[in-house]
Design a protein with these regions (language model features):
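A short, well-structured beta->alpha microelement
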Residues: 1-21, 67, 104, 192-217, ...
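Binuclear metal-ion centers of metallo-dependent hydrolases, dominated by the metallo-beta-lactamase
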Residues: 1-3, 111-112, 126-201, 206-211, ...
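C-terminal regulatory/interaction regions
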Residues: 2-3, 206-320
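His/Asp/Glu-rich metal-coordinating catalytic cores
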Residues: 2-23, 27, 33-156, 163, ...
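Short, well-ordered alpha-helical microsegments
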Residues: 38, 85, 103-104, 164-168, ...
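Short, conserved loop/helix-junction motifs that constitute active-site signature segments
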Residues: 41-43, 110-114, 172, 233-238, ...
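Short internal beta-strands
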Residues: 45-55, 119, 176-186, 244, ...
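Active-site-proximal loop/helix segment associated with metal-binding centers of metalloenzymes
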Residues: 81-91, 99, 103-104, 117-124, ...
Length: 320
């Protein structure tokens, strides 16, 4: 682990896993198109990424032009996180990137390969983070929306602009939602890749046509706090109710409320039990934990008999 992400030295090859900055040479892997995993490409090195990731990156203002989806003994593996998200398998090493093994609407859970060395994220690597089933979540949210509709209240579902907003668009399409303009742009790109998301108006057009005055209605918007000007406007003018979605909503230790009227646990990452299942399915000899509760999850795995350690800066090259 370095200040520029995870670097693995395997034989004569140098592999940069989700580097924060472009590298001049070696092999780089970009697992998915969330902003904390992207960088502008430069140099002569080989960059491995999915086509979906590169297209979403361009939409978000990043330049990834020269890339490969296949290279020698490197295999990308579906990570189930967002559209185009991949893990990387090479030399019996599996790097998960951000991963979810749970099916969520159109998003299918990750493919999990056997490996000798597992480098896994553990965003929710604490036992308190065990999420409700998708069916239970959808049922609960539909009940909330129905109750609010009965009172004539418009509802805004809030989730990350890339990934969760598309899951929400799919799961609650029967309410014929409007989309925040930024969500609409991402949804259109998802449709380009065959994801069956319903077309709808963006919020600017819907408001300009007076459609938001015809309450109740549903809207899918990016994750924003109650202090955001857009949310304050929607509440003051239309008396809208907000429902925020995040894995952090599972824990009372984290104040995910952020001024939302409701907070619902829903994540594009593995929960604690799913992380344990991931480890069992990989059946590795060595485990490195990255991103999240790295110390706690590694300690739990060690108690279960695994050879696990949190990945700190400059620690990985000593072992791989």
């Amino acid at each position: 682990m370095t200040s520029n992400g995870i670097i693995v030295q395997s034989g004569e090859k140098t592999i940069n896993l989700d580097p924060k900055r472009g590298t001049e040479d070696g092999i780089s892997f970009v697992s998915h198109a969330h902003l904390d995993h992207l960088h502008n490409q430069h140099g002569r090195g080989i960059l491995i990424a999915s086509k979906q990731t590169t297209e979403i990156a361009k939409l978000r203002g990043y330049s990834i032009n020269n890339y490969v989806e296949e290279y020698e003994n490197f295999s990308m593996v579906d990570a189930g996180h967002i559209l185009g998200a991949k893990g990387l398998l090479f030399d019996d090493v599996f790097y998960t990137g951000d991963i979810s093994i749970r099916d969520r609407g159109f998003m299918k859970g990750a493919m999990v390969p056997k490996c000798k060395t597992l480098i896994t994220e553990c965003t929710f690597g604490m036992p308190e983070y065990v999420f409700p089933t998708i069916d239970d979540t959808v049922k609960r949210v539909n009940e909330i929306i129905s109750e609010l509709y009965g009172k004539g209240k418009p509802v805004i579902l809030l989730g990350y602009e890339l990934g969760k907003a598309q899951i929400l668009s799919y799961l609650f399409s029967h309410w014929q939602p409007y989309y925040h303009d930024s969500v609409k742009k991402v949804n259109e790109l998802y449709r380009k890749f065959g994801v069956p998301l319903t077309e709808s108006l963006g919020h600017t057009e819907a408001e300009s046509k007076g459609l938001l005055d015809k309450k109740p209605w549903l809207m899918i918007a990016p994750n924003m706090s109650g202090k955001n000007e857009f949310i304050k406007h929607m509440k003051s003018k239309y008396d809208a109710i907000t429902i925020g979605f995040s894995g952090w909503a599972q824990s009372s230790r984290f104040s995910f409320a952020r001024g939302h009227d409701y907070s619902i646990p829903l994540s594009d990452h593995c929960d604690y039990n799913e992380l344990l299942d991931l480890v069992k399915r990989c059946n590795p000899e060595k485990i490195y934990t990255v991103h999240g509760f790295v110390d706690e999850f590694a300690a739990d795995l060690s108690k279960m008999g695994y050879d696990a350690q949190p990945l700190k800066e400059n620690s990985l090259d000593e072992f791989i």
